Swiss-Prot record:
It is an enzyme of class 1 (oxidoreductase). It comes from Rhodopseudomonas palustris (strain HaA2). Its EC number is 1.3.1.98. One of its GO terms (molecular function) is UDP-N-acetylmuramate dehydrogenase activity. The lineage of its organism: Bacteria, Pseudomonadati, Pseudomonadota, Alphaproteobacteria, Hyphomicrobiales. This is UDP-N-acetylenolpyruvoylglucosamine reductase. The keyword Cell cycle applies. Pathway: Cell wall biogenesis; peptidoglycan biosynthesis. It is found in: Cytoplasm. PANTHER family: UDP-N-ACETYLENOLPYRUVOYLGLUCOSAMINE REDUCTASE. Residues 33-198 form the FAD-binding PCMH-type domain. InterPro entries: FAD-bd_PCMH, FAD-bd_PCMH-like_sf, FAD-bd_PCMH_sub1, FAD-bd_PCMH_sub2, MurB, MurB_C, MurB_C_sf, Oxid_FAD_bind_N.
Length: 309
């Protein structure tokens, strides 16, 4: 348990409309279903509410924004400070306007692909197979099937730690492979994407292909977090992991997927420490076998058990 911060924040922010909770479990909000609590969990009502909250939040309080937790390990000791979770009700918009698709940061990537398809706009089909939200896609330049967020983004809207709103163009996002160089303290709230007119049949065929690939090649019905490690230049992470003999490797309740060995899975009773230790063991074995050091793609946040409180 962390010291109670939520009560003090509520008292200092009488006009807050969103939901503010103290020592709130985060495990149910992640795909791995592991991890400790947030000292404060804030779900803003909308962008104005988020700006109000940040404008009054003491500068020394750490802040982290999460989406649906599909690419996240929350450590067992939880997270000190404030965790902000953007909910679909205030940030889940997905609509088309001509050749532009507007999406809130809490909109599922899959929904954005479907919105584009309904408007007969191609180019965003790759989002159909990414199990996250647009906020996460902006932060990590999410991509699949040879396409990335930087290929379709027009601009993004974000709120800074002072509660001020910014519009960031494509160049300002400073995208690279699975990364953005934009200020890490910014919280993305929405984005605009450019589609290309295409036939409905062609769009649907690409989306079906994406889904079929996921069904056949990825453990999508397990408690997992998606691709664990980035592909090193010129290599596939899963091939390096397989060559190092890590397919099926298990530590505690965590296991390297037999189906796709760049996926770690919670086989029922894993702790965050089990999953992270397994990942580090994989990295060590790959380095020893190939000389290549894998880099985590999954974000690991929080403190280890026993540190909090």
């Amino acid at each position: 348990m962390f010291p109670d911060l939520a009560a003090d924040l509520k008292a200092a922010m009488p006009d807050l409309r969103g939901r503010l909770l103290g020592n709130e479990p985060l495990a149910p909000l992640t795909w791995f279903r592991v991890g400790g609590p947030a000292q404060v969990l804030f779900t803003p009502a909308d962008e104005d509410d988020l700006g109000y909250f940040l404008s009054l939040l003491p500068a020394e309080v750490p802040v982290l924004c999460i989406g649906v937790g599909s690419n996240l390990i929350v450590r067992d000791g939880g997270l000190p400070g404030v965790v902000i979770r953007l909910a679909p009700r205030g940030f889940g918009e997905a609509r088309s306007d001509g050749e532009t698709v507007h999406a809130g940061a809490a909109a599922l990537d899959k929904r954005v692909a479907e919105t584009a398809a309904a408007a007969q706009l191609g180019g965003l089909e790759f989002y159909f197979g990414i199990p996250g939200t647009i906020g996460g896609a902006l932060r990590m330049n999410a991509g699949a099937n040879g396409r990335e967020t930087r290929d379709v983004l027009i601009d993004a809207t974000a709120v800074d730690r002072a509660g001020r709103r910014h519009v960031i163009d494509l160049a300002g996002m400073q995208f690279s492979y699975r990364s953005s160089g934009a200020d890490p303290s910014l919280i993305f709230t929405s984005a605009r994407f450019r589609g290309t007119p295409a036939s409905p049949d062609a769009i649907r065929a690409k989306m079906n292909e994406v889904q079929a690939h996921r069904e056949l090649a990825q453990p999508i019905r397990e408690k997992t977090g998606g691709s664990t490690f980035k592909n090193p230049p010129g290599h596939s992470a899963w091939k390096l992991i397989d060559a190092a003999g890590c397919r099926g490797l298990r530590i505690g309740g965590a296991q390297v997927s037999e189906m796709h060995c760049n996926f770690l899975i919670n086989i029922g009773d894993a702790t965050a420490a089990d999953i992270e230790t397994l990942g580090e063991t994989v990295r060590e074995r790959v380095k020893a076998q190939s000389g290549i050091e894998l880099q985590w793609e999954i974000k690991r946040i929080g403190v280890t058990a026993g540190i909090a409180g």
